[in-house]
Amino acid sequence: VLAVVLMLLASVAFPAEAQAIPESSALYRLQLERETARQFGLDAPVARIAAQIHQESGWRPTAQSPFAQGLAQFTPATAKWLPQVCPEVGPPDPWDSSWSLRAITCYDAWLHRRVRAQPAGRALDECSRWAYTLRAYNGGEGWLNRERAKAAAAGANANDWRQVEKYRVRADWAHKENIGYPRRILLVLEPRYLRAGWPGKAACG
């Protein structure tokens, strides 16, 4: 009887979780796993970057916003610049899904390597490091670094993403969008993809 009950529960829970993830993601999963492993190694954060793509475009390669294009929502300027630090992505083409998957994984890895613990405060944990990586992707590395510096100058811990959220040097609307970006990816969407069986482990467990 218990086995039957468990099977029924699974049959109810799995479709609900699957419905929360766009079906189109299955078309890109294998390439995303390959590209993420290429950039991050065997413990690649596939579910995390899948969650980021979900946030960016809902897995729609034709997605377009006023300033960004494609699956990973690169601006034309960033797409043009990216091969300077990620030559392996090839000629910029945000509308091409294969290019976008190469680009988002390489750019995330590049930004992740550049996040440094500031001298004061506790060590930089992986949750904060990824929050800063995602904020840099979304709103620019320079703005983020200035806000971390402002937090440190005020006596806050610049290595704690929650403390840094309180400090702003950009427009209020841009700051709200930027701090909300990693919150949704790390706290809402990544756990959803992990529960659905995408590889990785939670950065903010």
PLM ranges: what are they?
Residues 14-27, 31, 35, 39-40, ...:
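Non-catalytic cell-wall polysaccharide-engagement segments
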Residues 54-80, 84, 140, 185:
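Cell-wall polysaccharide-cleaving catalytic domain and substrate-binding groove, primarily
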Residues 3-11:
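Bacterial N-terminal signal peptides
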Residues 40-43, 62-63:
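Short secondary-structure boundary/capping segments within folded domains
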Residues 37, 53-54:
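Short amphipathic alpha-helical segments enriched in leucine
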Residues 44-48, 54, 66-69, 129-130:
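Extracytoplasmic
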